[in-house]
């Protein structure tokens, strides 16, 4: 049986950020990833947005780690040459009934320490983005976008430079608490048993499934997994926007927004579809809903200009808005198993928060 100090399950942005932090502190780390490449699930199927920290309950892990992680991510991307752009964001109210809610989000942003945010008039909004239609808006200059794949590769490179080992196509079939550590049954082309002293469950959509297969962990400590599918539609033709354009948040999502990747491709999404099983297909019929929603803030959207693009699935623990839910970082204080950290509900703003979240995990292991 092979032995190591630390096993990290999952090679998305969260798992890789944690593995990097542990390896750079001299820990012996093995990263187990069930897929045949890094970051193929939640990490690859999102908007690639660096969030400011507006949508989260003051004092929550999401709020604290998003704001701290945002600054760390910008600094890291600049230092390491990861393509990114601080393009800014407009959060728009499209009718008078939404203005009170916009005011509330402004107040929450200030409580969370978001700097530079300001209320703008419809005229000011149109000076920033001539195609936008709104009755009021918030301008958030600190928001941006990042090349997620480059970020993933850089995290992995740092971890491997500190002697971490990545094993792809290595699903963890089950595990058990064993003395002062853990024993894992790992599948794949060369099945093996692997013992470790510290175990980080950063499996994303698979976190609850693995936790239930870990003998010695009380299953009552495992929260439910709620799947929130979000589809994206891309725009055929040139984007009219320089910034991110966000409507007000809705249940389960920060809104069906307009974003643009670093290559200039505009897309809209995600919407929210509560599902019972993993399904990444995008229903072309949803374009009707998308067109209706987008035209509230971009009336000049051309007919039939939206094409199905891709879908992502957010690993929630409840049917709740971003403001009403939070990350879950379970340690022995919650589940009474020393050396085990379970990460649940790491949805948006997980990408933005990833470096700060890794530091949080390090602190809880100390």
Residue ranges and their predicted role:
Residues 3, 25, 44, 324-366:
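C-terminal lid/capping helical subdomain adjacent to the catalytic/cofactor pocket in oxidative enzymes
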Residues 4-31:
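N-terminal Rossmann-like FAD-binding beta1-loop-alpha1 element of flavoenzymes
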Residues 21, 50, 82-85, 193-198, ...:
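Active-site substrate-recognition segment that forms the wall
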Residues 23-45:
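Glycine-rich FAD pyrophosphate-binding loop
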Residues 48-124, 134, 255-256:
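Dinucleotide-binding Rossmann-like beta1-alpha1 core, especially the glycine-rich loop
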Residues 56, 83-93, 116, 122-162, ...:
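Helix-loop-beta segment of a Rossmann-like dinucleotide-binding subdomain
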Residues 58-68, 92-101, 139-157, 281-286, ...:
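Short beta-strand to alpha-helix junction loop
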Residues 138-198, 355, 364:
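Helical element adjacent to the flavin cofactor pocket in flavoenzyme catalytic cores
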